């Protein structure tokens, strides 16, 4: 079981206590800059040491989705947004098998090597993975779904992938709509639990909204996905329609409207944890104005990048690889080579006009040495 948050009394269900801290507080507490390489390659879970190689199959057996030449399956859920787009995508099957213990046991005093924090291919992806993981325990707890990732202990529904954007959270997998309905519509068992009721339907998904009117909150439930919107600043139903429409092919997708984004996804979007942005350039005034961004690529070397996709893939119990793709106005190849994948080995950085690609590898031995320095 994960440790209690600081300054909180011991409680067996501390994730579900009413005065739960903000996502930012918890990210800081769990060490948001702890890298996936550190989480996975140091003290890897026993599950990761099975004979079966983790992450070797791109086919998702749980929900039947398969990455195609047109892009990874999660990309179908990313609608064309006239503003900007940020996302975090997690192959939960792989991450759960490999690093679930490390995700839960991360401590605030974990020493993270400075070179990891300074590497755009490591820190942002790691923060994204933790954000997606913690969203379920934090944000979904208010709907009675806070333990959805707990390996069948509380739910018959199973999770294969997680997708987070600033407006929405998508749980992909084998979902039992009746089970979710029972949780959402149940009489609240605690003060902080919000009761919902079925009020609408969108393209085969049953839509639930709070019994007590709350702007910006709606949950769509289907047998292959659970789509959550909980942001009072948006029209929740419109957001659901846009995202479900993209997934069903009845609304425009970001990948279809942007050649640079499609290229970046094809190049670097196939990892076990993937983050990306399309829109406000990294380091721009528009990006700086948003102090709570989902994806943080605020590195001087990436200033002016309008499209970025970065991913980490778990190859086995000892090795992770990273892939990076960006479209940057007037990129500085020397400066980029100093940071992209610099904390790993087998580093490669290539600049072709405005297109930048990079790859690197992180091995258990290298990570262990870095943490001792």
Regions found by a protein language model. Give the residues of each.
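Soluble, non-membrane globular domain cores that form compact, hydrophobic packing
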Residues: 2-167, 172-373
């Amino acid at each position: 079981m994960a440790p209690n948050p600081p300054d909180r009394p011991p409680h067996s269900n501390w994730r579900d206590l009413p005065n739960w801290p903000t996502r930012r507080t918890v990210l800081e507490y769990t060490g948001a800059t702890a890298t996936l390489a550190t989480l996975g390659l140091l003290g890897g879970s026993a599950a990761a040491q099975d004979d079966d190689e983790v992450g070797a199959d791109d086919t998702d057996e749980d929900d039947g989705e398969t990455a195609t030449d047109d892009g990874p399956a999660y990309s179908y859920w990313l609608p064309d947004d006239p503003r900007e787009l940020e996302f975090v995508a997690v192959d939960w099957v792989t991450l759960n098998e490999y690093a679930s213990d490390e995700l839960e046991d991360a401590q605030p005093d974990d020493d993270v090597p400075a070179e990891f924090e300074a590497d755009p291919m490591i820190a942002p992806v790691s923060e994204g993975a933790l954000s997606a993981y913690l969203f379920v325990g934090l944000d979904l707890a208010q709907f009675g779904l806070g333990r959805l990732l707990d390996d069948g202990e509380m739910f018959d529904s199973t999770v294969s992938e997680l997708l987070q954007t600033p407006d929405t959270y998508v749980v992909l997998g084998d979902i039992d709509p009746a089970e979710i309905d029972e949780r959402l519509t149940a009489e609240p068992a605690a003060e902080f639990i919000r009761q919902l009721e079925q009020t609408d339907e969108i393209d085969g998904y049953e839509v639930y909204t709070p019994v007590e009117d709350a702007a910006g909150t709606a949950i769509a439930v289907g047998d292959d996905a659970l789509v959550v919107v909980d942001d009072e600043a948006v029209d929740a139903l419109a957001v659901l329609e846009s995202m479900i429409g993209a997934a069903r092919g009845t609304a425009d997708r970001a990948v279809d409207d942007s050649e640079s984004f499609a290229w970046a996804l094809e190049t670097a979007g196939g990892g076990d944890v993937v983050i990306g942005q399309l829109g406000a350039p990294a380091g721009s005034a528009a990006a700086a104005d948003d102090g709570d961004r989902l994806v943080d690529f605020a590195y001087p070397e990436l200033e002016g990048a309008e499209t970025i996709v970065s991913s980490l893939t778990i190859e086995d119990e000892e090795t992770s690889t990273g892939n990076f793709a960006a479209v940057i106005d007037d990129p500085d190849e020397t400066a980029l080579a100093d940071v992209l994948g610099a904390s790993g080995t087998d580093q490669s950085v290539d600049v072709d006009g405005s297109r930048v690609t990079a790859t690197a590898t992180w091995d258990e031995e290298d990570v262990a040495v870095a943490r001792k320095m």
